[in-house]
Amino acid sequence: VLSDTVFAYVSDTKTPQGVMCVVRQRNKTAKKWERLIEKEQQKPFFLVLDNLQDPGNMGTVIRTAEAAGVTGILMSADCVDVYNPKTIRSTMGSVYRMPLWYAEDICEAVRELKRQGIHTYAAHLEGTVVYDEAEYREGTAFLIGNEGNGLRQEVAELADTWVRIPMAGHVESLNAAI
C-alpha cells in the first residue's frame, strides 16, 4: 500500500485510478514470429508498422488489430515503445494478448513474410488499388508507415500491392491508426 504522495510520484497521470503493478516485459525481438506463421491453420494476417511514433496511435492500432483478428504485429526497431504508459492505457489490455515483435531490419522481415507466402499490401497515398477492391485470398500483411511521412520508400517498394483509401474533401491522409 502506497501513500497518496508516493502514488502520485510514481504515477504518470494526474488522476490515477489507484491501482498499480510491476511486471516483467516480454522479449519482443523478431526471432520467434516466423513460428506463428507455421502454427496458423488459416491465412495469417499481419500488420507491419514502420516507425510509428505516437503512443496513442500505437495503442489504438494494437487494440483495433486484436478486434479485427490480426495474427500478430511486426514493428520496426524505431517504433514507439509498446510499454509506454499511454500506449498501454489506450490498448485497454490488448497489449498483453496481441503477439508483438520488434524487427531490427524491417525490410528483411517483410522479405521473410513474402518468402513464407504472405502477400504484402502497402498503405500508400499513391496506391493503385482501392483497399476494399483488393482480393485477400492468401496470407496477408498490411504495411503501415509513420504518422507524418508514411512508409519509408525502401519498405514500400517491397510490397506486392500498394493500396489506398479514397478520401473526399480536402483530406490528404488519415491517421496511421485508421
Please give the residue ranges for each predicted region.
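RNA substrate-binding interface of SAM-dependent RNA methyltransferases
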Residues: V1, T5, V22, K28, ...
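Phosphate/diphosphate ligand-binding glycine-rich loop within oxidoreductases
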Residues: V1-T15
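Short secondary-structure transition/capping segments
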Residues: T13, P85-T87, D132-E135
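Short, surface-exposed amphipathic charged segments that create phosphate/polyanion-binding patches used
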Residues: T13-Q17, L113-G117, I178
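Active-site/ligand-binding-proximal alpha/beta "capping" segment
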Residues: Y121-V171
